[in-house]
Design a protein with these regions (language model features):
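Extreme N-terminal starter segment of soluble prokaryotic enzymes
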Residues: 8-14
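Conserved mixed alpha/beta core segments that line enzyme active sites in large multi-domain catalysts
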Residues: 65-68, 169-173, 217
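Conserved mixed alpha/beta catalytic, RNA-binding, or beta-rich assembly cores of soluble enzyme
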Residues: 15-34, 39-45, 56-60, 75, ...
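Short, structured active-site "lid" loops
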Residues: 53-83
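Extracellular lectin-like interaction modules
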Residues: 46-50
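An N-terminal, well-structured beta->alpha segment
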Residues: 2-6
Length: 257
């Protein structure tokens, strides 16, 4: 597997509720060493054959297992119909910052669908890894991934960057990117080839609506719908007001260029 997960494989739960689905689940577990397979007790023998040593069986309803799975895992792979998964998880959803990444795979293993927390929760990255391992088609519906543009909430993640922004600022900057509005990218630190490694990999030139700068002081904030600032310094005096509501600040680790 060449793609990178957003969390350790040991933080992934795989859920399957049918005999044929459990066979596929064995392949998923093989692709994610350390992941755990959850199945109904009646399929214990099939599960042990498919993923020996990685099986947890439960009695009762699958829906009753969801709270514990949400609390214990960062990623949940469901080999269950998409509609059924919607009904199972709906009562337990909080917000995109807290919910785990959830991926759905059809029983034939043809399609891998990140259905919840694609970016912050890592579902898109998990889906990409599994699609590659299974020879399946990843079905990405997030606008930035469908259009292969910049995902504001993932910029620099592969390089260890963190970001500082409110929920509304992320929404505004993300909307500006996917709607082709002018966006400034000011990179004062971090280095690295972040574009080809971005969000499981991008190819070709940068988005045409993204204009690059080397220093924050070079930009006219009024000319841009959003400003993405990669730096280790604090905002210069007076700039907080100029960038209010439309800036995302990225902080590369100290040992980066």
């Amino acid at each position: 597997m060449t793609r990178q997960l957003s969390f350790p494989a040991s933080r992934v739960a795989v859920v399957s509720i049918t005999r044929h689905g459990i066979t596929l689940a064995g392949r998923v577990i093989a692709a994610l060493p350390g992941a755990r397979l959850f199945v109904p007790e009646k399929f214990r023998a099939e599960a042990d054959a498919a993923a020996a040593g990685a099986v947890s069986c439960y009695a009762g309803k699958t829906g009753d297992q969801i709270p514990a799975l949400f609390a214990s895992f960062d990623g949940i792979v469901c080999i269950v119909s998409l509609g059924a998964v919607v009904r199972l998880i709906a009562p337990h959803l909080k917000n995109k910052e807290a919910d785990p990444g959830i991926v759905v795979i059809d029983e034939a293993g043809r399609f891998v669908i990140p259905m919840l927390s694609g970016h912050l929760g890592g579902a898109n990255a998990l889906a990409g890894c599994l699609a590659e391992a299974l020879g399946a088609t990843p079905v990405l519906t997030t606008a930035s991934d469908a259009r292969q543009t910049l995902a504001v909430d993932l910029l620099g993640r592969e390089l260890g960057w963190t970001f500082e922004a409110s929920h509304d600022e992320i929404v505004r900057a993300s909307a500006a990117m996917v709607n082709d509005e002018p966006v400034a990218l000011v990179q004062e630190a971090g280095g690295g080839d972040w574009w080809t490694r971005h969000a499981n990999g991008r190819s070709g030139p940068l988005p045409v609506n993204l204009k690059q700068f080397a220093r924050l002081e070079e930009i006219d904030p009024e000319a841009f719908s959003a400003i993405l600032w990669v730096s280790r310094r604090e905002l210069p005096a007076g700039w907080a007001a100029k960038l209010a509501g439309k800036r995302v600040i990225y902080r590369p680790p100290q040992d980066a260029a």
